[in-house]
Amino acid sequence: MTLAQRELLVLCALATMGDTSAQLGPHGRACLQVGNSKAEVVAALVHCFPYIGFPRVAAAIRAVKGL
């Protein structure tokens, strides 16, 4: 697994937990630093929607929105 894939996985795992906006920002930045695009970050979070629900996905996207 590449570092970029690992960071996306961590970001999605944090999104599933809820109330992790303080951690989502730094991991969102790390996603970009290791080579993921903003579109990939958002797509990974949107892919979580059926599993974790809209409120958590929306909160995660808000947390990484300003990156």
Model segments located where?
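Hydrophobic alpha-helical segments
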Residues: M1-L67
